[in-house]
A protein has these predicted regions:
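Glycine/Thr-rich phosphate-binding loops that ligate phosphate moieties of nucleotide
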Residues: 1-142
């Protein structure tokens, strides 16, 4: 389910871009929420690996790094589904002993995107607002 807060009736390019960025931030905050839940269970996440789709654009990669507060590693692969199939095929064909080994052999980091310190407090405030809106939306649906 999604909640959109503050949506106006403006239809100019600036408002459309702002809505797009807000949507991407929502995806980033949702990912951050998952990472936080994993951390509470003892699973430490050091970085996010991204490839394919919208994740190919540098703006999306940087925004995810900023909203999650973790480095985003962009791979050289433009077709991650095919790469995944090749990795599994390498293991099945005994070319690699394990999926982990095949991943190390077939994947390579192309670029790194680090969280920008000057946006840290902004995204922390918005992340807290995101969680509050999420709780409010849950109450409304009950």
């Amino acid at each position: 389910r999604a909640t959109i807060c503050g949506l106006g009736m403006e239809n100019d390019i600036n408002n459309l871009m702002a809505l797009y960025v807000a949507g991407l931030c929502g995806i980033g905050y949702g990912l951050r929420q998952i990472i936080d839940a994993q951390r509470e269970c003892g699973v430490q996440t050091e970085n996010i690996v991204i490839s394919g789709g919208a994740g190919q654009h540098p703006f999306v990669r940087q925004l995810l790094a900023d909203t999650c507060g973790l480095p985003v590693l962009a791979t050289q692969c433009s077709e991650p589904v095919l790469l995944g199939s090749a990795i599994l095929g390498a293991v099945a064909g005994n070319i690699a002993p394990s999926v982990t080994d095949a991943m190390k052999q077939f994947t390579h980091v192309d670029k790194y995107f680090y969280p920008q310190a000057n946006f840290q407090s902004l995204h922390l405030r918005r992340y807290e607002a995101y969680k509050q809106l999420q709780q409010t939306a849950t109450v409304i649906r009950e």
